[in-house]
């Protein structure tokens, strides 16, 4: 019998959902302006947001940067097959790589699904040959380069 503490699911009311929806689209909105939109005081909005942060519902506030505007022109999705006994080791090494923007363990034969961004093709090739292929346990790598982005959403939308 496990005695590990489980955090209960937080029940969000409609006002919390409204606040989260607005913050998802307008993360820099002031508490005052947000309060006007959800019919609460600035102090009440701030208290609710702090509760959502403390409960782990809001993980962080961040800016979404357009990679092309800062010289990053190559966006690649990778499926990395790894020998099962090395999966955790490979994942821990890849999560430290600056080019890796997301990394997931997927269903299938020990698959890691990864997204990476690079300034050019040569940088991507160097990542593959010097950083990814040499990792112990990597069996195969499948890459798909992004041609055009139609939709990209950060975080979860309610």
UniProtKB/Swiss-Prot annotation:
SMART domains registered for this protein in UniProt: HTH_ASNC
InterPro entries on file: ArsR-like_HTH, AsnC-type_HTH_dom, Dimeric_a/b-barrel, Tscrpt_reg_AsnC-like, Tscrpt_reg_AsnC/Lrp_C, WH-like_DNA-bd_sf, WH_DNA-bd_sf
Residue ranges constituting the HTH asnC-type domain according to the UniProt record: 12-73
Name of the gene: ywrC
Name of the molecule in the record: Uncharacterized HTH-type transcriptional regulator YwrC
Domain of life: Bacteria
Gene3D superfamilies from the UniProt entry: 3.30.70.920, Winged helix-like DNA-binding domain superfamily/Winged helix DNA-binding domain
Any one GO biological process: response to amino acid
GO molecular function terms listed in the Swiss-Prot or TrEMBL record: sequence-specific DNA binding
One CC-aspect GO term: cytosol
């Amino acid at each position: 019998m496990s005695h590990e503490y489980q955090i209960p699911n937080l029940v969000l009311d409609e006002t919390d959902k409204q606040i989260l929806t607005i913050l998802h689209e307008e993360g820099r909105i002031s508490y005052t302006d947000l309060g006007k939109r959800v019919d609460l005081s600035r102090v009440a909005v701030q208290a609710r947001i702090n509760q959502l942060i403390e409960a782990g519902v809001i993980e962080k506030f961040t800016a979404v940067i357009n990679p092309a505007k800062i010289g990053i022109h190559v966006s690649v999705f990778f499926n990395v097959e790894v020998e099962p006994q090395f999966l955790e080791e490979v994942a821990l090494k890849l999560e430290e790589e600056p080019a890796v923007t997301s990394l997931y363990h997927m269903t299938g034969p020990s698959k890691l699904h990864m997204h990476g961004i690079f300034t050019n093709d040569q940088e991507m090739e160097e990542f593959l040959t010097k950083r990814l292929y040499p990792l112990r346990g990597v069996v195969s790598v499948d890459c798909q380069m992004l041609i055009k982005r139609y939709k990209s959403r950060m975080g979860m939308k309610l």
